[in-house]
């Protein structure tokens, strides 16, 4: 449940109004005046909390819940205890998120950590930088020459914005983030500790002079409505730019190499490693700890299972997984075949007595 120490306390709201907000049906209208004061999980909810249920793994929690009301699909409605008011919704979690966004908008987009509403006295801003009205710069942030920052953007504590960087409106640059050689659109959320625009890993290896560094003279382009998780690193391009497409959501601790192009509305889970000059299409989903080799193409709509290693191009809408990754149906068949071989070898009487 939301802690009032960190987040705004929701307004006390009648169930009838919650049904309207969530577009759910209150099965027993006589409970419409019951007041809800917060959101909680099934196991932590009390009589004045709203919860949701959409996964049978939590059936025991539903049975024991003390929640005042529960969003649930018609399929599971009969399992809700009698003391819990039922809000019928085709997609319970989506309905729950709808009211969570209504009540906890402050959790969607971080603001100044220190309650700052302007330029902190300890911030260092080059006189050639251009900041629109309404920009917030927290203490100890550094903004370099010729930087442009749009209105509504928050630059966190200790963040460093290098010369010539352009950041759009209504963005958030997390504490201790470093940005250089980058152009960033509107509504971009960059969590703390990110590094954007640093050198890519470019060398001529094992030559007579050792490892010869290749100049990295490209940029990072981040389009509108992108989210970049904490501790993520995005290298600038060597010749062409590194591009993150509109609406893409990147989890924590992801490494994106130089010259990578990521399309629109992609999903990248934590600890992914993308090697250089990789092209990823639109609406691609990559599971946690996926590694993808350089110079590959991942087609629109492709999905890759967590902890897979990709060394080949993936066609549009491909479903791949494994190490090395291959179409998931083939991967599963091979796993079953290997398990069968192991099982059969153990049952072979010729193997008795062998080490």
Swiss-Prot record:
GO MF entry, a single one: N-acyltransferase activity
Coiled-coil region(s): none
Record's catalysed reaction(s): a UDP-3-O-[(3R)-3-hydroxyacyl]-alpha-D-glucosamine + a (3R)-hydroxyacyl-[ACP] = a UDP-2-N,3-O-bis[(3R)-3-hydroxyacyl]-alpha-D-glucosamine + holo-[ACP] + H(+)
Enzyme Commission no: 2.3.1.191
CDD domains: LbH_LpxD (cd03352)
Pfam families: Hexapep, LpxD
Xref: Gene3D superfamilies: Hexapeptide repeat proteins (2.160.10.10), MurE/MurF, N-terminal domain (3.40.1390.10)
GO cellular component: membrane
Enzyme active site: 258 (proton acceptor)
GO term, biological process aspect, one: lipid A biosynthetic process
Pathway it works in: Bacterial outer membrane biogenesis; LPS lipid A biosynthesis
Record keywords: Acyltransferase, Lipid A biosynthesis, Lipid biosynthesis, Lipid metabolism, Repeat, Transferase
Enzyme superclass (EC): transferase
InterPro entries found in the cross-reference section: Hexapep (IPR001451), Hexapep_transf_CS (IPR018357), LpxD (IPR007691), Trimer_LpxA-like_sf (IPR011004), UDP_GlcNAc_AcTrfase_non-rep (IPR020573)
Superkingdom of origin: Bacteria
Function field: Catalyzes the N-acylation of UDP-3-O-acylglucosamine using 3-hydroxyacyl-ACP as the acyl donor. Is involved in the biosynthesis of lipid A, a phosphorylated glycolipid that anchors the lipopolysaccharide to the outer membrane of the cell.
Quaternary structure and partners: Homotrimer.
Family of the protein in this entry: Belongs to the transferase hexapeptide repeat family. LpxD subfamily.
NCBIfam families linked to this entry: lipid_A_lpxD, PRK00892.1
Name of the protein in its database record: UDP-3-O-acylglucosamine N-acyltransferase
Organism name: Bradyrhizobium diazoefficiens (strain JCM 10833 / BCRC 13528 / IAM 13628 / NBRC 14792 / USDA 110)
Name of the encoding gene: lpxD
